[in-house]
Amino acid sequence: VWGLILVAAIVGPWAGAVTVATDGGFWTEAIGADLAPKLAGGQESHGAPPGYHLLLTPFLAFPMTLLLPAALIGAWRHRGEAGVRFALCWFLPTFLVFELSPTKLPHYPLPTYAALAWLAARAFAEPLSPTARYAGAGLGALVGLVLAVGCVYLAALFGDPNDVWAVTLAAGLFAGAGLLPAWFMARRAVGEATAAALGLGILAHGALAALVAPGLEPLKVSARLEAALETARLLPRQGVAEAPVAVAGYAEPSLVFALGTTTELHGAAEAAAAIVQGRPAIVEAAEAERFRAALAQDGVGVREVARVEGLNYSKGDPVSLGIYMAAGREDGR
């Protein structure tokens, strides 16, 4: 009962405020337009079979991967303890909902990982069984090596050849974060294994984010569109061109963050209407023919001021995006 009261105290004020602020529209949009389609089928090309999140968990939880077998074995062995029951009731129902939902994205079950960390911490209360140690060592080593190979693969496909040192460093750290803790774990040095996994794992993720990721230019489509608009003096926050920007064929939240919350993510007809109104438009190649046909009906000329090509990694599709403005205008004024 007290748990329900606490939840109501935390969620209630926010739920009431958002209901009043949107006149109930938030719930209609969130449940009817967003949640329901995700439960009914794989939405926006993000469908996957059950087992998808389970397969990704060792990779997304790395370097905690080392202790996942111990956490699961300990959870079953001590399921009668109140703290363990709490963590299980936190993890299992939530994870199963995400696993059984047709629409899946890797980050959906991340809130459940804290429960896994809770169970992993509980495993330190007693010596680990040989099964937990060897399973953790093997799983951690395997995932570390796969992530190391993944760094090299990403860099080979999308990276800058001059960043080979950064890729080598990140890959080496991921491999070390898997292999060194596994060696300690096999020698029953659980504390040393955990310290090595945490230390090297943090350094590996830091190297990936700070040194490797910035060089993966083809994956940074939204950031490159923002830069191209700024160069052409069409970026809304510059206050030169009419706003907002209309976008057809590329509807990613990262672009809204880059260009502003008023950015219009619609189709070719709406992008053409933006040009007619003197606003810039971004059009993906698949929508270009319809875009130009709509402009021809209005008798309006258009010119392409920049083009950005890359990979929409959220869908796995290559994209080619043209930035357009009305013909005859030399800048965004």
Where are these regions (language model features)?
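Core SAM-dependent methyltransferase catalytic element
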Residues: 315-332
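Short periplasmic/luminal acceptor-recognition loop of GT-C membrane glycosyltransferases, typified by
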Residues: 195-320
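Alpha-helix capping/termination and helix-coil
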Residues: 115, 119, 128, 187-188, ...
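Transmembrane-lumen/periplasm boundary regions of multi-pass, lipid-linked membrane glycan transferases
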Residues: 1-107, 112-126, 131-167
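Extended hydrophobic-aromatic, low-complexity segments
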Residues: 106-109, 120-121, 130, 188-196, ...
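Internal/C-terminal transmembrane anchor helices
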Residues: 144-146, 174-215
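Hydrophobic alpha-helical transmembrane segments
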Residues: 165-170, 195-197
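Active-site beta-alpha connecting loops in nucleotide-dependent enzymes
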Residues: 135-139, 169, 216-222
